Amino acid sequence: MAQGQRKFQAHKPAKSKTAAAASEKNRGPRKGGRVIAPKKARVVQQQKLKKNLEVGIRKKIEHDVVMKASSSLPKKLALLKAPAKKKGAAAATSSKTPS
Protein backbone atom coordinates (compact mmCIF):
# COMPACT_ATOMS: atom_id res chain seq x y z
CA MET A 1 0.00 0.00 0.00
CA ALA A 2 1.34 3.40 -0.93
CA GLN A 3 2.04 5.76 1.91
CA GLY A 4 1.75 9.52 1.98
CA GLN A 5 -0.25 11.72 -0.31
CA ARG A 6 -0.66 11.25 -4.01
CA LYS A 7 1.82 13.25 -6.00
CA PHE A 8 -0.63 14.45 -8.65
CA GLN A 9 -4.11 15.39 -7.51
CA ALA A 10 -7.03 15.01 -9.89
CA HIS A 11 -8.30 18.37 -11.13
CA LYS A 12 -11.62 19.39 -12.61
CA PRO A 13 -11.33 20.73 -16.12
CA ALA A 14 -11.19 24.54 -16.10
CA LYS A 15 -14.27 26.45 -17.26
CA SER A 16 -14.03 28.45 -20.41
CA LYS A 17 -14.43 32.22 -20.17
CA THR A 18 -17.86 32.14 -21.82
CA ALA A 19 -19.08 29.44 -19.43
CA ALA A 20 -17.80 31.42 -16.45
CA ALA A 21 -19.56 34.56 -17.68
CA ALA A 22 -22.79 32.62 -18.24
CA SER A 23 -22.73 31.16 -14.72
CA GLU A 24 -22.13 34.67 -13.36
CA LYS A 25 -25.29 35.91 -15.08
CA ASN A 26 -27.37 32.94 -13.96
CA ARG A 27 -26.48 33.47 -10.31
CA GLY A 28 -29.34 35.92 -9.83
CA PRO A 29 -29.66 39.21 -7.95
CA ARG A 30 -27.27 39.96 -5.11
CA LYS A 31 -28.17 41.12 -1.64
CA GLY A 32 -27.76 44.71 -0.53
CA GLY A 33 -28.40 48.09 -2.03
CA ARG A 34 -26.56 49.34 -5.07
CA VAL A 35 -25.45 52.93 -5.42
CA ILE A 36 -25.10 54.27 -8.93
CA ALA A 37 -22.59 57.09 -9.04
CA PRO A 38 -24.20 60.32 -10.26
CA LYS A 39 -22.82 62.19 -13.25
CA LYS A 40 -24.00 65.70 -12.41
CA ALA A 41 -21.60 67.77 -10.31
CA ARG A 42 -24.38 69.20 -8.15
CA VAL A 43 -25.67 65.75 -7.23
CA VAL A 44 -22.12 64.57 -6.51
CA GLN A 45 -21.67 67.50 -4.14
CA GLN A 46 -25.01 66.79 -2.43
CA GLN A 47 -24.09 63.14 -1.89
CA LYS A 48 -20.70 64.10 -0.48
CA LEU A 49 -22.34 66.55 1.94
CA LYS A 50 -24.93 63.95 2.96
CA LYS A 51 -22.24 61.35 3.64
CA ASN A 52 -20.17 63.78 5.72
CA LEU A 53 -23.25 64.75 7.75
CA GLU A 54 -24.11 61.10 8.38
CA VAL A 55 -20.56 60.38 9.53
CA GLY A 56 -20.57 63.41 11.81
CA ILE A 57 -23.92 62.50 13.34
CA ARG A 58 -22.81 58.90 13.92
CA LYS A 59 -19.57 60.00 15.59
CA LYS A 60 -21.48 62.44 17.81
CA ILE A 61 -23.92 59.73 18.90
CA GLU A 62 -21.06 57.32 19.64
CA HIS A 63 -19.25 60.00 21.63
CA ASP A 64 -22.38 60.80 23.65
CA VAL A 65 -22.95 57.12 24.43
CA VAL A 66 -19.33 56.68 25.55
CA MET A 67 -19.48 59.77 27.75
CA LYS A 68 -22.73 58.65 29.36
CA ALA A 69 -21.39 55.14 29.96
CA SER A 70 -18.08 56.38 31.37
CA SER A 71 -19.81 58.78 33.75
CA SER A 72 -21.98 56.01 35.21
CA LEU A 73 -19.12 53.55 35.73
CA PRO A 74 -16.82 53.76 38.77
CA LYS A 75 -13.84 52.68 36.67
CA LYS A 76 -12.55 54.63 33.68
CA LEU A 77 -13.54 53.23 30.31
CA ALA A 78 -10.69 52.07 28.08
CA LEU A 79 -11.50 52.63 24.43
CA LEU A 80 -10.06 50.30 21.82
CA LYS A 81 -8.66 51.85 18.68
CA ALA A 82 -8.32 50.24 15.28
CA PRO A 83 -4.85 48.86 14.55
CA ALA A 84 -2.53 51.34 12.87
CA LYS A 85 -1.64 50.99 9.22
CA LYS A 86 1.66 49.38 8.24
CA LYS A 87 3.54 52.64 7.64
CA GLY A 88 2.29 54.25 10.85
CA ALA A 89 2.74 51.10 12.94
CA ALA A 90 6.54 51.19 12.87
CA ALA A 91 6.66 54.86 13.82
CA ALA A 92 3.99 54.48 16.51
CA THR A 93 5.69 51.55 18.22
CA SER A 94 9.10 53.20 18.27
CA SER A 95 7.76 56.40 19.84
CA LYS A 96 5.83 54.62 22.64
CA THR A 97 7.52 54.25 25.99
CA PRO A 98 7.00 51.06 28.03
CA SER A 99 4.91 51.52 31.16
Swiss-Prot record:
Q: Which InterPro entries match?
A: UPF0390 (IPR019034)
* Pfam families according to UniProt: DUF2462
Q: What organism does the record attribute this protein to?
A: Homo sapiens (Human)
Region Disordered: list its residue ranges.
1-36
Q: Which protein family is it in? A: Belongs to the UPF0390 family.
What this chain does, per the entry, is described as: May have a potential role in hypercalcemia of malignancy.
PANTHER family xrefs: LEYDIG CELL TUMOR 10 KDA PROTEIN HOMOLOG
Q: What protein is this chain from?
A: Leydig cell tumor 10 kDa protein homolog
